[in-house]
Amino acid sequence: MDEISSMLDYLGIKSTEELFSDIPLSVRKKEIGIGSPLDEHLVLERARKYASLNSTEMLNFLGNGIYDRVIPEAVNYIISKSEFLDSYTPYQPEVSQGMLQSIFEYQSLISDLFKMDFTNASMYDGYSALGEAARMAYRINGKNKILIPESTYDSKLSVLKNYVWGLSMKIEKYKMNEEGKIDIDDLQSRIDGDTSAVVVENPNGYGVIDENVFRISEIKKESLLISYVDPISLGVLKPPGEYGSDIAIAEGQQLGIPMNFGGPLLGIMSFKADYVRKSPGRLIGESVDADGKRAFVMTLQTREQHIRRAKATSNICSNQALLTLAAGSYLSILGSSGLKKVALLTIKHSKNLAESLGNIGIEKVFDSISFSDTLFRIDKNVMLDLAKKGILGGIKLTSLIKDSKYSSGTFFTATEKTDNEKIKALVNALEVIM
């Protein structure tokens, strides 16, 4: 008699099945149903078959925060090096001189691009950077009202609300004018003694390049100016530091980081020197070691894991160090002339896109100049029909801002990759659909 039979006999049962008789069959473990084992080459064949179902080669006219841009292969090579790829937040920072230097270089590059005094080591993404900026403004002046443009996307507003609700801060929207730009009179009427900060976007949520942001420093009174910018656009547009921004933030995905579904992004935050000790996250600085050699250190690390919770400025945990390396590498490879070229190509292709759609009767909502995202008047929801033709595009504004008065507004996006051939394919598809 084998061991199992002996145990069954001792227990007075006939099979192991009786041990689980009180467990319903519907919740018991079953065969997974993946079939028998395959040889290596057959596994690869199966994987390729599944991969072929992906829609990776579709023409892309999507944007509104995440963009399809050219990424130099050198960027991918650098961030794939195991010394960086496997690194976590350096808790003994001086040991990780390479990682610290890469963050220091990133901070320097962004500060130069934004024309701001300091840049922190990173935030999670652009939206969380906005939330942290609002909290930073509260720490600076103790006031409880934030003014944001009506072109702010609902998802961004939701994150902002989540960040400031514990401070009992009030979020109030100001109007945009018929050009899709800041309504200066309306904004000015809302700024009072309780206003902690005015948030501006350039380009804004309508995709419009808004020169009215240059006037805000004249009317903001004692409140702070928080500027949410597109880093690629700064290749040609005036940087936030040159129009009086106290805090400048951005989503850094465009700087050498691929598009992804639920993966990591990069929150950029820069600020004036006066506010450095109110800033969240970490700040890497340059010093010298005991031998007088150049060394890098965590100059500030005011998060709750490092200092007393009551004194911490943020509970941000892991920084986005690998993505700051990608952004720093991207900016270093392109240089100022390369970034300017990418920005100019983006504007050129956006203009070509608008003219081409205009030729078939699809007009822009605003006559103003757009950067990447352009809002068109299209009553029909064309997104699914375009997808069937291998084209991604046609985001409805009301899917981004539910109560927007521009119900017919539909976005199409251009980058440096959007050449005339791709635009022609979109035009041909829309002519059939419309």
From Swiss-Prot:
Could you list the residue ranges forming a coiled coil in this record?
Answer: none
Q: Which GO terms describe its biological process?
A: glycine decarboxylation via glycine cleavage system; nucleoside metabolic process
Report the catalytic activity. N(6)-[(R)-lipoyl]-L-lysyl-[glycine-cleavage complex H protein] + glycine + H(+) = N(6)-[(R)-S(8)-aminomethyldihydrolipoyl]-L-lysyl-[glycine-cleavage complex H protein] + CO2
Please indicate if the UniProt record lists Oxidoreductase as a keyword: yes
What EC number(s) is this enzyme filed under? 1.4.4.2
Q: Which UniProt keywords apply?
A: Oxidoreductase
Functionally, this protein is described as follows: The glycine cleavage system catalyzes the degradation of glycine. The P protein binds the alpha-amino group of glycine through its pyridoxal phosphate cofactor; CO(2) is released and the remaining methylamine moiety is then transferred to the lipoamide cofactor of the H protein.
Record GO terms (molecular function): glycine dehydrogenase (decarboxylating) activity
Entry-linked Gene3D superfamilies: Aspartate Aminotransferase, domain 1, Type I PLP-dependent aspartate aminotransferase-like (Major domain)
- Tell me which family the UniProt entry assigns to this protein: Belongs to the GcvP family. N-terminal subunit subfamily.
State whether it acts alone or in a complex, and with which partners, per the record. The glycine cleavage system is composed of four proteins: P, T, L and H. In this organism, the P 'protein' is a heterodimer of two subunits.
Q: What class of enzyme is it?
A: oxidoreductase
Heme: is it a keyword of this entry?
no
Gene name of the record? gcvPA
Which InterPro entries does the annotation name? GcvPA (IPR023010), GDC-P_N (IPR049315), PyrdxlP-dep_Trfase (IPR015424), PyrdxlP-dep_Trfase_major (IPR015421), PyrdxlP-dep_Trfase_small (IPR015422)
Q: What's the superkingdom here? A: Archaea
**What is this protein identified as?**
Probable glycine dehydrogenase (decarboxylating) subunit 1
